[in-house]
């Protein structure tokens, strides 16, 4: 149970007692531990402080039994921790210094894994070393010989501040026992219960030593919130994992225009998010209040100190709402288009002056340049790799097509299997369902090389099809200020050299009260007018892909859909469960980054709504896609490729599938990564579950998967495609899919965002005016014929929208200095098991092999989708990276 008092209230404690009454006089009241120095104060007698007690019942039970005296053995304990950063000198800091001097920093208790606890073995740990960022503590126990192996420890934080406990090592005569903690421990004044940590040895529930079973159960109940007596908002120090709907993205109490529907439930199905316990809004009880401060996530889900203070983490995400008004204030015409392309180029070459006192330099050091003490700072973006390699590549049709296979969103291109293209929407509402892209147009554009029937048979036609997804939103989005929308289809033809060529773009508007359905097909032109119309149509089509990428391929399929796996794992899988330990690296920081996204990215009036074409319908649209298209069994890479017609099963092929497009960089690299992950998971699962009965009888494992399906993804719980955990293959498939989504999938759609989207004409996030050929006026046609470049610039995002997106994409594309890349470091529990350690080393070797393969492929000029003059190399699935914006690196988890 957590006390409601804040730490600040602890500062009012009476500390006026003479220090001489507590301990011998010292020359000064200062912390004797300075960075890099050992504490030279006399240590209290450890033997005297070590407490070994027995219960009265045990004494009475054995009172008549004569036994040989039990010998004690000495056990040394070494603890590594990091303190919470607190600025300045506070009363609580003074009290903590007193605790250090008295040698009572942490209370540590040992838990036997052999027999039920008959005695208590505990000691106070004293801080003996402090060298930023780590602190070292030591303690010594006298443990009875028959105590048995230590299976767990309990720790109570005697400080008046939080402590990040990294790990504990116990040194016994027969060897060492390690406890990897990686957890924040609240002060005793806030949480008086002792925190339990289990050793690095993993146990299935049925194999858990009997004395540890009750602790295993109690810890899960704590994380489920069963021991919480209070009601209301969860506090910063709590570790409760629970579910809620997305009812906190709107802010109706602050502005009625920011009211948003609840996302999650029958009307708008969606994955669940972490519960915060905040009060309902006064103006809309179905929504949750968004008052100031950080959104709750369980304490151990928050960023570490390193990530939290870096410009890629908490600091910038929290500051986005205040950063953007300052940037907007220095733009000459924030709501207007850029006047010419040179003005866009100047964002990289000259920059924009910022007031010296804006305070943005520490937050955005990559893009804010300091010119000197007396001069203003400059907002100047680094040129993205796309225009660094070829300044005009974004204009070319071949680059437009190449990016569907090797760009930012390789998840949308699909094979055309039926002709003609026909909508599945109700024609009574949306008009004629048949596409205007006819066989005559296709055969003309492919120069008579083959008929449509031959192209279908030979799998030569591919499409970006956003028609049925967008058409229901067109009229609604067009009612928003300075925004337009079409439903689009973009058709591509596969050439003999495995490159795609755009054939046609169809833009459609549904009928409304004032006019009938409108649609038109645009093709690459060979005269000035048709060329400009084609470029304008291409701009609309690319913006649709950019919005779909951000909302669906990125946010929905990785961030939002992963959160329920994390919540369920912490509620149902013990920290000593082998599957928890296998998945835990893949869950690092995701809940925190999702909470930040709800605060400033996907919230009402946030970046997505302000700068992307769906506007206030963004999450509503992603809900529609989740309800219609999302299937867990199709989230693995091979299944996704097969679903889109980009591969077919072939057991004789290297990865068990044969690609429809041989030079598909994302798929070619991704399948190697997928296989490496699957082989690692297979070795791991078969080690801990040699008998399939162990899977079906594992109540924690079954409880986790049941909660994922029935609560976390409860809006789709009745779907027939959910896997059932009965066999090794079932479990391997589920775990491999989750590991892939959090690592390879997310890396492929995230870390190239600035490289491809930083120059926004390549990836415009919205379009603001209609095609000149839709209900043309004399004035609009005149402007188009006299200044088509001006019309294109008006179609692009405004100066404000473009600049804010560039700042955001730079942030989202940045690797943190403390990034943990897949296969780079192994968990301590893996290293302690020889079979698992060997399997991990094989996994690591396969990832190193992938790095070499990617390097070789990127210099093979026969692979035209990833190599050639000015072509951006495909490196998004290279496993490791330096920190910063690199366009490569696959972290274990969705950490940004």
Curated annotation (Swiss-Prot):
One of its GO terms (biological process) is response to herbivore. It holds the Pfam family PLAT. Residues 175-232 are annotated as: EIF4E2 binding. Its EC number is 1.13.11.12. InterPro entries: LipOase (IPR000907), LipOase_C (IPR013819), LipOase_C_sf (IPR036226), LipOase_CS (IPR020834), LipOase_Fe_BS (IPR020833), LipOase_plant (IPR001246), Lipoxy_PLAT/LH2 (IPR042057), Lipoxygenase_dom_3 (IPR027433). Keywords: Chloroplast, Cytoplasm, Dioxygenase, Fatty acid biosynthesis, Fatty acid metabolism, Iron, Lipid biosynthesis, Lipid metabolism, Metal-binding, Oxidoreductase, Oxylipin biosynthesis, Plastid, Transit peptide. Residues 1-56 form a transit peptide. Induction: By methyl jasmonate (MeJA) and wounding, probably through nitric oxide-mediated (NO) induction. Slightly locally induced upon herbivors infestation such as aphids (Myzus persicae and Brevicoryne brassicae), or caterpillar (Spodoptera exigua). Induced by leaf-volatiles generated by herbivors-mediated wounding such as (E)-2-hexenal, (Z)-3-hexenal, (Z)-3-hexenol or allo-ocimene (2,6-dimethyl-2,4,6-octatriene). Increased levels by bacterial pathogens (e.g. P.viridiflava and P.syringae pv. tomato). Repressed by WRKY62. Fe cation binds at residues 554, 559, 746, 750, 896. It catalyses: (9Z,12Z)-octadecadienoate + O2 = (13S)-hydroperoxy-(9Z,11E)-octadecadienoate; (9Z,12Z,15Z)-octadecatrienoate + O2 = (13S)-hydroperoxy-(9Z,11E,15Z)-octadecatrienoate. In leaves and inflorescences but not abundant in seeds, roots and stems. One of its GO terms (molecular function) is metal ion binding. It comes from the Eukaryota. Residues 202-896 form the Lipoxygenase domain. Pathway: Lipid metabolism; oxylipin biosynthesis. Residues 79-199 form the PLAT domain. Its cofactor is Fe cation. GO terms for cellular component: chloroplast; chloroplast envelope; chloroplast stroma; chloroplast thylakoid membrane; cytoplasm; cytosol. Belongs to the lipoxygenase family. Interacts with EIF4E2. 13S-lipoxygenase that can use linolenic acid as substrates. Plant lipoxygenases may be involved in a number of diverse aspects of plant physiology including growth and development, pest resistance, and senescence or responses to wounding. Catalyzes the hydroperoxidation of lipids containing a cis,cis-1,4-pentadiene structure. Required for the wound-induced synthesis of jasmonic acid (JA) in leaves. This is Lipoxygenase 2, chloroplastic. It comes from Arabidopsis thaliana.
